[in-house]
UniProtKB/Swiss-Prot annotation:
Disulfide bonds: none annotated. InterPro entries: 3-IsopropMal_deHydase_lsu (IPR004430), Acnase/IPM_dHydase_lsu_aba_1/3 (IPR015931), Acoase/IPM_deHydtase_lsu_aba (IPR001030), Aconitase_4Fe-4S_BS (IPR018136), Aconitase_4Fe-4S_dom (IPR036008), IPM_dehydratase_rel_enz (IPR050067), IPMI_cat (IPR033941). The keyword 4Fe-4S applies. It catalyses: (2R,3S)-3-isopropylmalate = (2S)-2-isopropylmalate. Keywords: 4Fe-4S, Amino-acid biosynthesis, Branched-chain amino acid biosynthesis, Iron, Iron-sulfur, Leucine biosynthesis, Lyase, Metal-binding. SUPFAM superfamilies: Aconitase iron-sulfur domain. PROSITE patterns: ACONITASE_1, ACONITASE_2. Pathway: Amino-acid biosynthesis; L-leucine biosynthesis; L-leucine from 3-methyl-2-oxobutanoate: step 2/4. This is 3-isopropylmalate dehydratase large subunit. It comes from Shewanella sediminis (strain HAW-EB3). Heterodimer of LeuC and LeuD. It is an enzyme of class 4 (lyase).
Length: 466
């Protein structure tokens, strides 16, 4: 029977499947951080249980850490409790921890792949909604709740219902300057923020195949923003080249065996998907969100939509509510929208390729008057590489702030947050009301678009001179 990539990985991980119960699947890698793990560790202690597979559990600190200082004294009281609790729990249960002083510390969905923890054909879970990022390697990766975190810790398994399958094909090749972020925002704009609900999405087509691993991670990272359980890209030579030699990747004879196994991780030609979506890559322009969810997106040469043009009453009301919150008027040219904050970072766009793209638009320029712009590398390794290439100097000379790794301004959980009324060009993944701070307004863009907005003081079409 022909199978999709998802079905192949799923079937190889089903431990037991009983009638009337969700199947029990095996988990290969469990990633944890300081925010969603304390209750799970406490549950193990109360029940007197050990960690089932500490060697398959990896911890880091990212959500509530400071990007200005690696000192515990820089943390808020609650953040310090979370960080110190994770330290204690990892020591007690024998979990490998990349703490704020470790050179490889970083955002969990950045450091996992770059250390080779993420591998094709594996099942990966984390108490974080953007775990789908790891699907870029042909892994089945998804976020779980705290009670599920405890279940995985105790059993290395999880009960899950099998999802439906969706193929999203991006045909042809994108124009110069169009990035993975533009591709995924265009996809969400087409199918909506709930278009993938109930599905595991496989991204394919020439435009996807042409992406680097960093780009594929950006696309899969935002699968959750279209409602999908997970996103996947079939592994290929680009995947293997990225993983070769990384710390936790197979070595020697095991590497050759892995390459052979990964070659089978592709959807069979006659496999049938439950749903299919097609986009033409050549139609994709630089994208940015105008509203309060990732599906409210438009091309840079487009206009803020007019709710009066919408016949669906529910959609019309949603547009009206969003426009009121973001303080934009229907018909406004997106290039006329000014910003006063810029955030380049997050598990969506904080890898070395992202910083290189942003630096191209910052080099030799200055951040516009009245604009505050920060660049937050996704990990210690990304920061080290960027500094070796001189990217930090480019940003600093242009007036950007260069920070330590962490989730930072993606969410208003740590000290990096917006004030009410701030309008931010952000490379993160969510633009919900208050996501970056109470009363703040977020526009999701690529790193290149964010850097260009920082120096112009407003959104610009990076395909043109500005």
């Amino acid at each position: 029977m022909a199978k999709t990539l998802y079905e192949k990985v799923w079937d190889s991980h089903v431990v037991v499947e009983n009638e009337g119960q969700a199947p029990l699947i095996y988990v290969d890698r469990h990633l944890v951080h300081e925010v969603t793990s304390p209750q799970a560790f406490s549950g193990l202690k109360v029940a007197g249980r050990k960690l089932r597979a500490p060697e398959k559990t990896f911890a880091t600190m990212d959500h509530n850490t400071s990007t200005k200082s690696a000192s515990l004294d820089a943390l808020s009281p609650m953040a310090r409790i979370q960080v110190e609790t994770l330290q204690d729990n990892c020591k007690e249960f024998g979990v490998r921890l990349y703490d704020i002083h470790h050179k490889n510390q970083g955002i969990v969905h950045v450091m996992g792949p770059e250390l080779g923890i993420t591998l094709p054909g594996t099942v990966i879970v984390c108490g974080d909604s953007h775990t789908a990022t790891h699907g870029a390697f042909g892994a089945l990766a998804f976020g779980i709740g705290t009670s599920e975190v405890e279940h995985v810790m105790a059993t290395q398994t999880l009960r899950q219902n099998k999802a439906k399958t969706m193929k999203i094909e991006v045909r042809g090749h994108v124009a110069a300057g169009i990035t993975a972020k533009d591709i995924v925002l265009a996809i969400i704009g087409k199918i909506g923020m709930d278009g993938g609900t109930g599905y595991v999405v496989e991204f394919c087509g020439e435009a996807i195949e042409a992406l680097s691993m960093e780009g594929r991670m950006t696309v899969c990272n935002m699968a959750i923003e279209m409602g999908a359980k997970a996103g996947m890209v079939a592994p290929d030579g680009i995947t293997a080249e990225y993983l070769k030699g990384r710390e936790f990747a197979p070595k020697g004879e095991s590497w050759e065996q892995a390459i052979a196994a990964w070659a089978e991780l592709k959807t069979d030609e006659d496999a049938i998907f439950d749903a299919s979506v097609v986009l033409e890559a050549s139609d994709i322009a630089p994208q940015l969100t105008w509203g309060t969810n990732p599906g409210q997106v438009v091309a840079i040469d487009g206009l803020v939509p007019n709710p009066e043009d919408e016949s669906n009453a529910t959609v019309k009301a949603s547009i009206e509510k969003a426009l009121e919150y973001v303080a934009l008027s229907a018909g406004t040219c997106m290039t006329d929208v000014s910003i006063n904050k810029v955030f380049i970072g997050s598990c969506t766009n904080s890898r070395i390729e992202d910083l290189r793209d942003a630096a191209l638009h910052a080099k030799g320029r200055k951040v516009a008057a009245g604009v505050t712009a920060i660049v937050v590398p996704g990990s210690g390794l990304v920061k080290e590489q960027a500094e070796a290439e001189g990217l930090d100097k480019i940003f600093l000379e242009a007036g950007f702030e260069w920070r330590l790794p962490g989730c930072s301004m993606c969410l208003a959980m740590n000290d990096d947050r917006l004030e009410a009324g701030d309008r931010c060009a952000s490379t993160s993944n969510r633009n919900f009301e208050g996501r970056q701070g109470r009363g703040s307004r977020t526009h999701l863009v690529s790193p290149a678009m964010a850097a260009a907005a920082a120096v112009a003081g407003h959104f610009v079409d990076i395909r043109k001179a500005y």
